[in-house]
């Protein structure tokens, strides 16, 4: 066999093989490659969208956290103000009540002092009358009178 005829036969066989591959093998390979490219592009797009959604969600979460912190701080401040107001109200009520009790006690003490004075005056008057009666009943004697007045003074 001659090299030229072998070469031509091989070229014809190769051309038939290439046409067969282009007709039956190449379209499914190109379709698979295109599908794979499309899936990769969709995956990249989905990843970009998910990344953007994640950034948006993180920003929203941060805003919500900031808002919640602000609300919590406001609630705590309001609670502290209410607690302080309650303490101040209780203090003022306690002071008013203490002053009222002190005034009542002072009035009671004053009343008892007045009663004691009146009782003492009555006793002094009785003793003075008794002393005068004793002096008048006995004979008039300066030493005896002085001694009775000393006893009377001791009783007072």
Swiss-Prot record:
InterPro entries: ATP_synth_B-like_membr_sf (IPR028987), ATP_synth_b/b'su_bac/chlpt (IPR002146), ATP_synth_F0_bsu_bac (IPR005864), ATP_synthase_B_chain (IPR050059)
Claim: Ion transport is one of the keywords in the record: yes
Membrane topology (UniProt): Single-pass membrane protein
Record localization: Cell inner membrane
Key words of the record: ATP synthesis, Cell inner membrane, Cell membrane, CF(0), Hydrogen ion transport, Ion transport, Membrane, Transmembrane, Transmembrane helix, Transport
TM annotation in the entry: 11-31
Protein name from the UniProt record: ATP synthase subunit b
Organism: Psychrobacter cryohalolentis (strain ATCC BAA-1226 / DSM 17306 / VKM B-2378 / K5)
């Amino acid at each position: 066999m001659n090299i030229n005829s072998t070469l031509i036969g091989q070229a014809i066989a190769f051309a038939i093989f290439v046409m067969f591959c282009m007709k039956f093998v190449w379209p499914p390979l190109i379709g698979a490659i295109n599908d794979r490219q499309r899936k990769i592009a969709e995956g990249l797009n989905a990843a970009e969208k998910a990344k953007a959604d994640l950034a948006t969600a993180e920003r929203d979460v941060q805003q919500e956290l900031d808002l919640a912190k602000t609300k919590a701080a406001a609630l705590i401040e309001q609670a502290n103000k209410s607690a302080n107001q309650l303490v101040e109200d209780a203090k003022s009520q306690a002071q008013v009540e203490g002053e009222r009790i002190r005034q009542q006690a002072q009035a009671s003490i004053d009343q008892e002092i007045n009663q004691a004075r009146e009782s003492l005056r009555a006793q002094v008057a009785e003793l003075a009358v008794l002393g005068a009666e004793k002096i008048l009943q006995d004979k008039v004697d300066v030493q005896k009178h002085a001694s009775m007045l000393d006893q009377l003074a001791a009783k007072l």
